[in-house]
């Protein structure tokens, strides 16, 4: 289950969905690629079987930094793709689990080590911390979406309560758009070439979705 759908920018009611599905005995993996720093995410309260999310998108950590949270009763069934010294250790289960994932091959752990510092630093930039940052970003995303919708005389594709720091806008077309041309979407190219603004363009039948990402900077 997505926290926020990347192609559409829709904020899913993932908290309710996790509860409803797990009540039926089904394990849930929450895809929080656009979760940390974008929407409130309490992994203990959510209590999903598995949660994974990126930190380089909204928390501003180095690329390649993410987290994987596995509920304690599910940890014995999960192993890293590359085994290390932890595989043969005789530690207690929780310590063995952590050691197995701590050091796999020659991967540089620096991006992960930046996560707590980034959370503290970015959160200190405004008086209200992360709660204020996320709400400010959300309001700016709605403001930007409404400006574009007014200019295009089009209706917002989603209600405000399904908006986070991301919001998509439909750009109408008379053609049946199946895929973006190899040389790129014309509006995407113009925004980048002339203004150095990079905008994701998602193809849908009869229109393109372009979405606004608004962060603290």
Which residues does each predicted region cover?
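Active-site phosphate-binding strand-loop segment of PLP-dependent enzymes
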Residues: 1-33, 37, 58
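Structural detector of well-ordered beta-strand residues that form the stable sheet scaffold
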Residues: 29-31, 52, 79, 157, ...
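Conserved PLP-dependent catalytic core of the aminotransferase class-I/II
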Residues: 111, 115-157
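PLP-dependent enzyme catalytic core of the Aspartate aminotransferase-like
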Residues: 180-182, 189-217
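A short glycine-threonine-serine/GTX helix/turn-capping micro-motif
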Residues: 95-110
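Conserved PLP-binding catalytic core of the aspartate aminotransferase-like
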Residues: 135-142, 149-194
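Active-site PLP attachment segment
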Residues: 46-91
């Amino acid at each position: 289950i997505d926290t926020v759908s990347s192609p559409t920018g829709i904020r899913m009611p993932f908290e309710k969905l996790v509860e409803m599905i797990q009540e039926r005995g089904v394990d849930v993996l929450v895809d929080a690629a656009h979760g940390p720093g974008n929407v409130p995410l309490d992994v203990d309260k959510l209590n999903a079987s598995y949660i994974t999310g990126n930190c380089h998108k909204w928390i501003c950590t180095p690329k390649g930094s993410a987290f994987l949270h596995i509920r304690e009763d599910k940890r014995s069934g999960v192993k890293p793709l590359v085994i290390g010294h932890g595989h043969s250790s005789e530690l207690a289960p929780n310590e063995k689990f952590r050691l197995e994932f701590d050091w796999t091959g020659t991967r540089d752990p620096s991006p992960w080590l930046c996560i707590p510092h980034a959370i503290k630093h970015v959160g200190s930039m405004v008086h209200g911390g992360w709660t204020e940052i996320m709400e400010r970003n959300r309001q700016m995303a709605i403001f930007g979406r409404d400006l574009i919708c007014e200019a295009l005389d089009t209706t917002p594709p989603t209600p405000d309560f399904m908006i986070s720091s991301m919001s998509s806008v439909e750009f109408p077309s008379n053609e049946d758009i199946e895929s973006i041309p190899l040389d790129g979407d014309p509006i995407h190219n113009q925004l980048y070439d002339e203004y150095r603004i990079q905008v994701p363009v998602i193809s849908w039948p009869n229109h393109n979705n372009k979405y606004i990402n608004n962060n603290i900077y």
